[in-house]
Amino acid sequence: MNKVFSDFLAWTREHEWGCDESYNLTLSNGTKLSVWDSGVLEVSPASPGHKDVVLSCAVHGNETAPIEICRDIINDIIDEKQTVTHRTLFLIANPASINKGERFVEENMNRLFSGEHGKGSTQNKERERAAKMENYVERFYQSAPEGSRERFHYDLHTAIRDSKREKFAVYPFTHGAPYSRQQLQFLLACGVDTVLLNQAPTTTFSYFSARQFNAHAFTVELGKVRPFGENDRAKFAAAETTLRDLISQTELDFGPFEPEQHYVFKEAQTINRTQPDFELNFADDVANFTSFNKGELLAWDGDKACYAQHDGEHIIFPNAKVALGHRALLTVVRVPTESLDLV
């Protein structure tokens, strides 16, 4: 067995911007492994179930816990320790940023999907890689067996800063479609009891899959950024176990839906950095989901003051150093789970 399959992550990192060759391996249990590119592995059971599952990591290369989880699941599949019932596509999205140990090399990849990679005059390898990721997702979903099928995409991340709600997921804008009760239960089984509802289209990987392919797709934040080997894997055990169950079991049983177990937030404000002189009005170590009250100053964008518009307005993803025109701060307010349009 060559290095492609003996150590898929290491081989991927050796080919950080891609590999033109493809590789195939059929396991003794009949499962077919197809490597389409560095970091791109399709797993096809001999008799696939009705689900098509995309598991992506390393859109940001320093978010190592999801990379370790995907690495271990892949290794166990190859060693035939992990059964696979449903077609699964693993994507290690940005290997060059893994090697650099940084969030990205030149540009934030999670702002480059839904065709954003081709807009404007800027061109770089991250944009090229994002375009390839889109193509691989399309190829995977479009090559599924005929019949009634369900599509899933969980884009796994960890956050830069601490969070008062350690694990949370971003539910892409649904364009008026109802939310999935079963997906909230799946996330809860992963240890993710907090969900943020996007209120508009975005250029994230999960929104791309949701919008273009009607997939159940989420950006899943599983904790905080740590270097390789320093993640407390016990904190990620529920997520890893549930992801393993997703690809191995025909159906998952979550029991009755209990709204009070879920903490749901919707966007209140998106504050973009439009001026070079942008400053957040709180310390760098203030945690995600810290609450502010109406009228409290959140940031200065040049000479424009940005205030909280609601009592109980929580901050998410503050980053004063983003590129001009990008989001520097998101704020959210809680909404009752019972108020959602759920199916």
UniProtKB/Swiss-Prot annotation:
Q: Where does Zn(2+) bind?
A: H60, E63, H157
Q: Which domain of life is it from?
A: Bacteria
Cofactor: how and how many bound: Binds 1 zinc ion per subunit.
GO molecular function: any one?
Answer: hydrolase activity, acting on ester bonds
What are the BP-aspect GO terms?
A: arginine catabolic process to glutamate; arginine catabolic process to succinate
Top EC category: hydrolase
- What is the active site of this protein? E221
Per the record, the pathway is:
Amino-acid degradation; L-arginine degradation via AST pathway; L-glutamate and succinate from L-arginine: step 5/5
Which UniProt key words apply to this protein? Arginine metabolism, Hydrolase, Metal-binding, Zinc
Under the heading Pfam families, the entry gives: AstE_AspA_cat, AstE_AspA_hybrid
Which Gene3D superfamilies does the record match to this protein? Zn peptidases (3.40.630.10)
For the keyword Transport, the answer is no
SUPFAM superfamilies xref list: Zn-dependent exopeptidases (SSF53187)
Function according to Swiss-Prot or TrEMBL: Transforms N(2)-succinylglutamate into succinate and glutamate.
Q: What is this protein called?
A: Succinylglutamate desuccinylase
Species, as recorded: Idiomarina loihiensis (strain ATCC BAA-735 / DSM 15497 / L2-TR)
Q: What is the lineage of its organism?
A: Bacteria, Pseudomonadati, Pseudomonadota, Gammaproteobacteria, Alteromonadales
